[in-house]
Structures are given as structure tokens and as C-alpha cells.
Amino acid sequence: MANNKKDEQAAAATPISRLGYEACRDELIEVVRQLEQGGLDLDASLNLWERGEQLAKRCEEHLAGARKRIEDALAAGEADDD
């Protein structure tokens, strides 16, 4: 259990811009779980909520990038067919 707490703290210390999609998603799930569980003071809850918002935004950026790569690949495939 202590290792899990250390892992959570290390993840929270990692800049969001350096996290991959899966790491962002997993941390976001954990943030939501902690917020839903309750028992945190207001400041801790706000800090978690802000981190969650940043994580959600980064997840959306990763998905938008993946979507663009797929669209580009499909467009290139269609151009090759012509």
C-alpha cells in the first residue's frame, strides 16, 4: 500500500505535458475516485479537481492527435488510390 501512495505522489509530481494518454487517463480515473470518495478538505479537493481538469484536457489533446493521424493516413490512402 505504501508503494501505491508513492506511485500516486510521483504521478502527481510529473508534469502533465510529459504524460502519455494511458498515464493521463489512469491518473484521471484515480482523481475522480478520490473526489467521489470524499473526506478531503476543500483545498485538497480543489487541487485534485484542478489536476483532473488538466488531465482531461491532455487526454483530449492526445485523442485529437490520434484522430488527426488516422484522418491523414486515410487521406493519403485515398490519394494513392487516385
From Swiss-Prot:
Enzyme superclass (EC): hydrolase
UniProt record similarity statement: Belongs to the XseB family.
Protein name as annotated: Exodeoxyribonuclease 7 small subunit
Organism: Mycolicibacterium paratuberculosis (strain ATCC BAA-968 / K-10)
Gene Ontology CC, one term: cytosol
UniProt-listed InterPro entries: Exonuc_VII_S, Exonuc_VII_ssu_sf
Subcellular location(s) of the protein: Cytoplasm
Pfam families for this protein: Exonuc_VII_S
Entries under HAMAP family matching the protein: Exonuc_7_S
Biological process terms in GO annotation: DNA catabolic process
Broad class of the protein's primary localization: cytoplasm
Enzyme Commission (EC) number: 3.1.11.6
Subunit structure of this chain's protein: Heterooligomer composed of large and small subunits.
Domain of life of the native organism: Bacteria
Catalytic activity, reaction form: Exonucleolytic cleavage in either 5'- to 3'- or 3'- to 5'-direction to yield nucleoside 5'-phosphates
Physiological role: Bidirectionally degrades single-stranded DNA into large acid-insoluble oligonucleotides, which are then degraded further into small acid-soluble oligonucleotides.
PANTHER family found in the cross-reference section: EXODEOXYRIBONUCLEASE 7 SMALL SUBUNIT (PTHR34137:SF1)
Entry keywords, A to Z: Cytoplasm, Exonuclease, Hydrolase, Nuclease
GO molecular function annotation: exodeoxyribonuclease VII activity
